[in-house]
Amino acid sequence: SEPYVMGSHATCSGAWVSGPEDISPPEYYWGYNRMMTVQGLFGAGDTVGGSAHKFSSGSFTEGRLAAKAAVKYIEEQKAKNIKVSDEQCEKFKKIIYKPLENYTVGRNEITGGTVSPSYISPIQGLQRLQKIMDEYVGGISVNYMTNGNLLKKGLELLDWLQEDLENVGAEDYHQLMRAWELKHRALTSQCVTEHTLFREETRWPGYYYRGDHLKLDDENWHCLTVSRRDPKTGKFTMEKMPVYHIIGDEEKKKAS
């Protein structure tokens, strides 16, 4: 069982990326192999969805494919109009280093132990995230079982955690790294919970079970599910995407 996201390495979950030009249907291809829906951003390994159990061999192979496509993207001058101003850099520096400021301002408010009224530490947020995902999103403590009501409650608690993570504090650069790891993990967990709620079936028995939809439902859910998150509101929109079996039965027979 993995922390934060149960069965994460085997659920095919991850970013939606373009497939290779030679075999991808139109819905799976938009210009460059392994490029995400954000132009110029490429992914590989566990970052990318659509394939389970990549392990190190699959991940570094996919990394090589993504790197070659990124180089091609640059060589074809697709990135020539990308401009980054000093003002943008300063803005992001303030965002990145904010946990250090939160700690510096709030540390003198602690009267005992490690609990501050104005910030939470990365370890405190991490423990909350683990508890939410374990108890509400089908972790080992509940025998990998969840349901619609539990998932909705989990999303409510994850929303509260996201609010508190605006005030995460870091006493040094190592804790700053931990703070940003926590922010990214919390967002990933939120996304997985939204998808688990949206998919009303049990697609991967053994990794999680929807107690209110225990059976596999190919009639309604033989598909991919994709989401978009509004960066301003934090709200997700969900939709289904078709699954194309690019390698058909005849090819499988030949391969075996």
Outline where the language-model segments fall.
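Glycine- and aromatic-enriched mobile tails/lids
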Residues: 10, 22-256
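Short loop/turn motifs at secondary-structure junctions and domain boundaries
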Residues: 5-9
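Core active-site phosphate/anionic-ligand binding loop and the adjoining beta-turn-alpha structural block
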Residues: 1
